[in-house]
């Protein structure tokens, strides 16, 4: 029995990937497993989906190295910053990196020992990283850097998850213009721009889709969730246990600051999970959890390691299961955020329990691997 844990359903992740492939114009999938696979555990998930995807994408060098050391053999691309020192390590581990600045590329080319596979990052309107269209003359100069082997070029959409397709189409057209110019100058193998939202909503063609949030069964936005262009299965649940149940009287307060006071005699349950585990303090007095198929509202402030809920109308006892985020979209909206943030904030002290074909196949926690089948 586990106390605080994330249950991850491998079968659902695999089915989500196959469903995305069915509707996408691009059959090559790059699985985005940055931020520890959005909090769910990158190395374990990557092992189970490696045969379904063409690439893996991460945010930084340490994430990439972690995948490679764990045994992943498919290509890995870093989407964010890589230092000059880390670039040398990327050569050793066969990790691909983005190039988005000429002087930066020159420093890397001068520093590394051996050849390094790179992808040209293009800024088509997201204004994060990348060469802009008017800087094409600087892109051409990358041809002079003999150690940098240009394998791909990519960009990123800003509003692909919104109903208005105008800006997404503008970005795509800009990407295609640059692509045609690049084809005249380089022998580039892979052009990629589509994210989860673009892959399931937009009729856009490139060589590969980068799928992150949708792979884990979460729609990129409320709008896409309502459209239901594709059936995604949420592949994870955050669970805990009831640690204590007691009755309090009218006027009794709950938790720090006495922000909650009972208006009548009531029953509360304590759950041994708090903001140190990634259950946001912002859920104080507004969050909801599920106990024995009934909703229980958070009472008072969420503590570092514990949270109290109203179970006046729920028959429950110590060790009963608690499901946090019974509706992750609704809970995210309550505190003005998105499911992405709730997922990626899940702390490493939460045990990750992986299930496939109805059985536990792997267990991880911050103390190290506990079980693998």
Segments predicted by a language model, with ranges:
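Active-site-proximal beta-alpha core segment in soluble small-molecule metabolic enzymes
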Residues: 4-8, 12-15, 22, 27-181, ...
């Amino acid at each position: 029995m586990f106390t605080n844990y994330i249950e991850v359903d491998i079968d659902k992740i695999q089915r989500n990937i196959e469903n995305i492939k069915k509707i996408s114009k691009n059959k090559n999938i790059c699985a985005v497993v940055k931020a520890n696979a959005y909090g769910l555990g990158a190395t374990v998930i990557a092992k189970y989906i490696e045969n379904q995807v063409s690439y893996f994408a991460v945010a930084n060098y340490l994430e990439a190295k972690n995948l490679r050391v764990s045994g992943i053999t498919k290509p890995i691309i870093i989407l964010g910053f890589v230092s000059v020192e880390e670039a040398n390590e990327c050569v050793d581990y066969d990790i691909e990196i983005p190039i988005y600045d000429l002087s930066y590329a020159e420093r890397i080319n001068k520093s590394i020992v051996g050849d390094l596979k790179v992808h040209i990052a293009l800024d088509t309107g997201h204004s994060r990283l990348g060469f802009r269209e008017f800087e094409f003359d600087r892109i051409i100069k990358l041809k002079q850097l003999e150690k940098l082997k240009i394998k791909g070029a990519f960009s990123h959409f800003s509003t692909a998850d919104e109903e208005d397709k105008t800006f997404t189409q503008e970005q795509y057209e800009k990407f295609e213009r640059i692509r045609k110019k690049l084809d005249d100058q380089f022998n580039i193998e892979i052009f990629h721009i589509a994210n989860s939202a673009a892959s399931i909503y937009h009729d856009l063609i490139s060589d590969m889709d980068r799928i992150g949030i949708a792979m884990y069964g979460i729609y990129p936005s409320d709008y896409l969730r309502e459209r239901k262009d594709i059936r995604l299965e949420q592949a994870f649940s955050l669970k805990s246990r009831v640690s204590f149940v007691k009755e309090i009287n009218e006027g009794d307060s709950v938790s720090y600051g006495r922000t909650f006071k009972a208006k009548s005699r009531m029953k509360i349950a304590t759950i041994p999970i708090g903001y140190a585990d990634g259950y946001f303090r912002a859920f104080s007095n507004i969050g909801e959890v599920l106990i024995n198929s009934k909703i229980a509202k958070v009472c008072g402030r969420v503590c570092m390691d514990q949270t109290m809920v109203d179970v006046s109308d729920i028959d429950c006892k110590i060790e009963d299961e608690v499901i946090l985020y019974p509706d992750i979209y609704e809970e995210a909206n309550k505190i003005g955020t998105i499911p992405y943030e709730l997922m990626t904030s899940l702390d490493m002290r939460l045990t990750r329990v992986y299930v496939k074909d109805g059985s536990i196949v792997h267990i991880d926690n911050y103390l190290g691997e506990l079980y693998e089948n």
